[in-house]
């Protein structure tokens, strides 16, 4: 950046700049840092709904079973699947992506929780989200969407303490920066739950 003396702006395709540029340097030197991420919010939101339905209904496993000639039928094919209807759905981070995702989920449920300490409570309440602590979200939720950007304060904030609070059949979908989650803890807990 120091060598780019005529640089006026940087366009980033991510909503988060921490991992790939010195935002503070840009700010101090009058370099605009702009994000194109909001353009992709609807696309990612629709993918998120697809992932959620696949996890809840075990579509991915049914596909694998079908390919391997181990297709199951009737009760056996639905033993571990569940409905999205009337689930408690939570958003960790309530930015552009959450604002696109929530309306897609409203036909299934109206029980939404949110955690976003960087936003005013009124914004979450105006979007019909009950404000909760991370502990409460991990205890109560059937589906948790991790949508927050990474900061120095939230790196690995989702750790074994929180993950161990999750209900047995709840779903965790990480659609933001992976560093918000401690993956070593996630892998250990995932192996225990199988």
Q: Which residues make up each language-model segment?
A:
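Phosphate-binding beta-alpha-beta segment of Rossmann-like dinucleotide-binding domains, i.e.
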Residues: 29, 36-88, 103
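Short beta->alpha connector loops at strand-helix junctions that form conserved
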Residues: 13-14, 30-42, 135, 176
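Rossmann-like adenosine-cofactor binding region
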Residues: 119-194
């Amino acid at each position: 950046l120091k060598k780019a003396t005529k640089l006026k702006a940087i366009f980033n395709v991510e909503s988060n700049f921490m991992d790939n540029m010195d935002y503070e340097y840009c700010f101090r030197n009058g370099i605009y840092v702009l994000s194109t991420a909001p353009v992709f919010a609807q696309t990612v939101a629709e993918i998120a709904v697809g992932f959620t339905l696949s996890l809840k209904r075990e579509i991915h496993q049914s596909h694998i079973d079908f390919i391997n000639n181990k297709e199951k039928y009737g009760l056996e094919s639905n033993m571990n699947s569940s409905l999205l209807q009337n689930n408690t759905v939570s958003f960790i981070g309530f930015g552009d992506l959450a604002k696109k995702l929530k309306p897609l989920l409203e036909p299934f449920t109206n029980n939404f929780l949110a955690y976003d300490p960087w936003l005013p409570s009124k914004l979450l309440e105006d979007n019909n989200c009950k404000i909760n602590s991370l502990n409460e979200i991990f205890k109560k939720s059937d589906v948790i969407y991790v949508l927050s950007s990474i900061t120095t304060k939230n790196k690995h904030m989702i750790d074994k303490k929180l993950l161990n609070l999750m209900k047995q059949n709840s779903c965790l979908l990480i659609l933001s920066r992976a560093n918000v989650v401690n993956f070593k803890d996630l892998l250990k807990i995932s192996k225990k739950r199988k």
